[in-house]
């Protein structure tokens, strides 16, 4: 497997979610993920409860392939970063064990201050160091 430093990967991964340029975001997606890679999101508890109340058996949200990943990242950017109040940053302490990288991230005010959101990310990598599966667990 390619020699990937966990904290470097964490920084590149999190920077993607705050990238304002759509072409650079798409390029980063194609560089970070393997073709056909997946992003699997466990929504916050309140959303899971609402979905369960509506009769949904599974409340896991998924995006597969570059096009769906592009939509997912772009929507997150538009909702949280584009208005200009917040940005995402990787926290220190990313670790790698074989083909898995665990990292924590946070959403912070652009001018600095306490984190207002964050979560845990578990990235499964292929032999070239690209993401095959990205498990996201938001919530501090």
What kind of feature is each model-predicted range?
Residues 1-140:
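C-terminal and inter-domain tail/linker signature
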């Amino acid at each position: 497997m390619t020699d990937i430093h966990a904290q470097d990967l964490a920084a590149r991964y999190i920077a993607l979610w705050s990238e304002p340029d759509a072409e650079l975001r798409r390029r980063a997606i194609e560089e970070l993920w393997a073709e056909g890679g997946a992003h699997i999101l466990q929504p916050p508890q309140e959303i899971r409860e609402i979905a369960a109340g509506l009769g949904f058996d599974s409340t896991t949200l998924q995006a597969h392939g570059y096009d769906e990943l592009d939509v997912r990242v772009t929507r997150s950017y538009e909702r949280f970063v584009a208005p200009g109040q917040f940005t995402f940053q990787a926290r220190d302490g990313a670790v790698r064990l074989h083909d898995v990288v665990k990292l924590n991230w946070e959403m912070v005010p652009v001018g600095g201050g306490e984190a207002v959101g964050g979560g845990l990310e578990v990235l499964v990598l292929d032999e070239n160091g690209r993401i095959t599966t990205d498990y996201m667990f938001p919530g501090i």
